[in-house]
Amino acid sequence: MNAPYSYREASYTPVPASWRWWPLATREAAQLFRSRWGILLYGLCLIPFLVRSVILMIVFGVLNLGPESLRTRLQTRPIAAGGPNAELDPRRVGFYAAQALEPPAFVFILLLTSMVVARAIARDRATNALELYWTRSISPAQYVLAKWVGGTLLVGSITVFAPFVLWLLAVFLAPDWTLLQTTAGGMAMLLGGLVLATGMLTAIGIFVSGAAATANGAIVVWTTILVGGGAIAELLAAVLRLPELRSWIAPWTAFGVVVRSIAGLNARGASMLGAWCCLGTLLLWSFWRARKRLRIEDALA
């Protein structure tokens, strides 16, 4: 002990790299819950899950809501595969995929990724927080990895964990174990596809954030990619009468096509090759734009 200054001696103890970047990842995943507005936003993103939960309980007779004829039909007869209402039948894997892939889910995923993923690095740069490179002794690659893991955990709680919880609820509400036996394999493939596609989507968002000068600019670019790409794809598909163009141009459509193709679900009018090319091209482009701005020299500038 140094008496005049009351300093304590400390010895250098090396720690694994994961011990240095993992706290940053968990902090990023919990960032949204640090304000009331963030908690409200996350609650809004759970609306598709809550709606599907109500449908699930109606089908299995826990709730008596809606017209009696509809309840009877849902409870007694599985909906024909490929029919207009096939994704309302919890005895099919498509019911759980729709919770994360249908158009209403897009609005909430867009909000969530815009406020968290697309701002992750740009927000740190605006507050000079890239000094984490030397205060936590992490490399730029580890910093980006931490941001990606944190963002993926948060978005994945909606796109992956929520469908899984919904399926578990259906398994325990079902009168026997038939639902488990008939959907377990399909659900495993669906969850794998959701994990892969969610990871790619959040990686693109993280790189967009890394390339942007400001957090607001990152949100604008990210929204333009998802919404603008979808609008252009819809226009060209209608004019040229080529519905598969949506898979090549619209990132959200490509997200759904990748998941459905891995899960073995119906993806009519879609191109799996186009979907992979769309997401892969965006991933490479955003990485190329971000790589120079994430160097240590940039953090010192």
PLM features: what roles do these ranges have?
Residues 2, 11, 58-96, 216-296, ...:
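Terminal transmembrane helical anchor/hairpin motif
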Residues 17-19, 26-44:
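Membrane-interface helix starts
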Residues 120-152:
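Helix-loop-helix units of permease transmembrane domains in multi-pass membrane transporters
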